[in-house]
Amino acid sequence: MISMRFSYLLLLVGAAAFAADPSAGKKLAFSDDFDGDKLDEAKWSVSGAREVFTFVKVGKGSALRIGLKVKDDMIQTNTLTSRGKFSQQFGYFEASMRMHAGDGHAGAFRLSTDDDKTPPSITTSFHGTGKERVSPWARAVLDSGAQDFRPDKAIGKFTDISKKFHTYGILWTEKGFTWYLDGKAVHKLDRKEFVRPMSLTLTHRIEEQDRPKLILKSLPDDVDIDWVKVWK
């Protein structure tokens, strides 16, 4: 009996260890360490204000910083995307990011179907909204129209989303999507109809409905990306 219980415990430990590493058994298909002083345009395209994309020192290396452009209305979307240069069907997509601190703007790590206007397509993301908040989120375009998918409750209380780098990951399989924060599964969406390749996007934006919450004197308040990896 003791031996059987011990074997069962080993199985549980093994399963937990595997769950903590969704890249296990996969090969690296795409990566960027942002260790240079300019963007690799073979991997990325930029939209928005190009001048807000800069490189900053992080430890012995560097990170990509996506800032905000100060202008009259402040409405903006500054985006780095692999669309048209890299996309993939299924796999594990992850990024090490330090989110912004304040309210009124949003940083995001996002996967989107390449042709995201043709159903069935989907955008899945980790969405940071300031004040140490981050949440998994998805929006699908279906034959019946657009549909959002969100957790029923917050995935946790955080105190350091803007103070340190965390690893945000999305595992996409034939069965659906699982969101990981620092290797721990925090949300799941079981939908099988999304099968077309997806590309990776990193963004920092201010939308019109969020603008009243923005405190200009709190700027600069940036989103930093240490690295990106995609596993197949």
Residue ranges and their predicted role:
Residues 11-20:
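Hydrophobic h-region of N-terminal signal peptides that target proteins for export
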Residues 20-232:
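GH16 jelly-roll
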Residues 1-9:
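Bacterial N-terminal signal peptides that target proteins for export
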